[in-house]
Amino acid sequence: MKKQLRSSFSTQGRRMAGARALWAANGMKKNQMGKPIIAIVNSFTQFVPGHVHLHEIGQLVKAEIEKLGCFAAEFNTIAIDDGIAMGHDGMLYSLPSRDIIADSVEYMVNAHKADAMVCISNCDKITPGMLMAAMRLNIPTVFVSGGPMEAGEWNGQHLDLIDAMIKSADDSVSDQEVANIEQNACPTCGCCSGMFTANSMNCLNEAIGLALPGNGTIVATHENRTKLFEDAAKLIVENAMKYYEEGDESVLPRSIATRQAFLNAMTLDIAMGGSTNTVLHLLAVAHEAGVDFKMDDIDMLSRKTPCLCKVAPNTQKYHIQDVNRAGGIIAILAELAKGGLIDTSVLRVDGMSLAEAIDQYSITSPNVTEKAMSKYSSAAGNRFNLVLGSQGAYYQELDKDRANGCIRDLEHAYSKDGGLAVLKGNIAQDGCVVKTAGVDESIWKFTGPAKVFDSQEAACEGILGGRVVSGDVVVITHEGPKGGPGMQEMLYPTSYIKSRHLGKECALITDGRFSGGTSGLSIGHVSPEAAAGGNIGKIVDGDIIEIDIPARTINVRLTDEELAARPMTPVTRDRYVPKSLKAYASMVSSADKGAVRLID
């Protein structure tokens, strides 16, 4: 049954003459009146290398859409660079920006009654923020990301942003070596080149089904990235017509992002050792979609999903461009499907089932298409380059080695345990998260005395100042969603632990969170957080912390009675919190619920 266009409220009828005059002043032609108005939700900014190249691409998408008879209108969201905001109070704003992005998209699309969306995202909070908005709005939507940065190279070794951060705090590394790494770590536009939060989310968007194959892995500089944008433009017109002309609701975000799709996405995340931030974001997106998806589901999946892909920061051997050469996200999904670990009946935004997509896009499938082979042959250009789609390098040979290559089959998994795990215990009754793919197996069981800090800044000073020694468990409290507020990423403390050559000799736990660039025994999202009365806020220096990843437990060696009787440790830090962040703190949930806003 035909659906009424949302935009008809401002384009149809005599009394809408004023609105039509304004649409005409925006460039709408008479023959576009009464056709779907498609919002191009861009996120261009010159503050973020993952978005610096998106300035003109929105207009390319607009031109492609308008060739097909619809009207397209572009607007922008904010975008914060977590790497630049890291290590100072700017990081307090990062996670809250996710909700502002979601709100701004909802505001613009609903205020102007757009009928469909193309979401051009890329970096850490932008993709989940736009996904949250897509679930709220539930209109035809296609996602296409700006693509990953190429890996840097120095002295024949691949490197990235995290190398620059670690080496700069290592006194044994010369100033010249640090300068060389700095100059080569981030050679192109795009989101940082490892399986950090941005790339993790763009990869998961393929598994959720709202993005096309290659979305998460084709480098930003490659000509095939531009083709993805062109394909997204054509697809959104097709899907808008399916919905409004034919009443086909299968193209709607909530029809695609079902519970099974979220389970598939989380299974992929565990299999590829993605960022722990994805746990927060998938929980939040599912909340907006009205899908029953919780920490217990993640725990369940983590116990049966092996690690099939290791990429920086979990190894320096591979970066995202290597995942693309091995067949991209579809290749990992294909291996998971062989083991019955995902549901391949789910539908995708391109109209195919996941099973059909695997058949056409898996590079080991006998039915793989030429288009798929071209996508996954997209190579790095290996030169400094800030222009989207400006190079055409192709691999001559793809990585189909599932025994020793970048992507493994189930028989040759990197580990039987997946890349993420949920731990529970008297420190974290509601759970906490660790990226096991980044933890050396020698410290999967770890016991040591606590060294407690009530801020990221104090922890950094303690680590660099020698207060933290081999065998310690660094505990950073009052950095959760409420306590920060804003749930800062602890990338600098974890990097400094490595700089001090303690990466296999210390652990870190916090009610804050971690960058996707973090590795090591780093346990975050402790819930309930200290600011909500959680037991992490009662730990004092010298308390013995016991971590057991195989058993999925984390405890302080105190009885329930001792913990109940112990008061919360006073907060000694001096931190200015502006009203905007106080407002966020007043309604944000705990990390185990995705740090979503709780509004009656």
UniProtKB/Swiss-Prot annotation:
InterPro entries tied to this protein: Dihydro-acid_dehy_C, DihydroxyA_deHydtase, DiOHA_6PGluconate_deHydtase_CS, ILV_EDD_C, ILV_EDD_N, IlvD/EDD_N
Top-rank taxon, per record: Bacteria
GO biological process, one term: isoleucine biosynthetic process
Annotated Pfam families: ILV_EDD_C, ILVD_EDD_N
UniProt pathway: Amino-acid biosynthesis; L-isoleucine biosynthesis; L-isoleucine from 2-oxobutanoate: step 3/4; Amino-acid biosynthesis; L-valine biosynthesis; L-valine from pyruvate: step 3/4
PTM sites of type N6-carboxylysine: 125
Active-site residues annotated for this sequence: 515 (proton acceptor)
Sites where the protein binds Mg(2+): 82, 124-125, 489
Catalytic activity, EC: 4.2.1.9
Broad enzyme group: lyase
Nucleotide-binding is among the record's keywords: no
Subunit-structure text: Homodimer.
Family classification: Belongs to the IlvD/Edd family.
Purpose: Functions in the biosynthesis of branched-chain amino acids. Catalyzes the dehydration of (2R,3R)-2,3-dihydroxy-3-methylpentanoate (2,3-dihydroxy-3-methylvalerate) into 2-oxo-3-methylpentanoate (2-oxo-3-methylvalerate) and of (2R)-2,3-dihydroxy-3-methylbutanoate (2,3-dihydroxyisovalerate) into 2-oxo-3-methylbutanoate (2-oxoisovalerate), the penultimate precursor to L-isoleucine and L-valine, respectively.
Protein name stated in the entry: Dihydroxy-acid dehydratase
Organism expressing this protein natively: Bacteroides thetaiotaomicron (strain ATCC 29148 / DSM 2079 / JCM 5827 / CCUG 10774 / NCTC 10582 / VPI-5482 / E50)
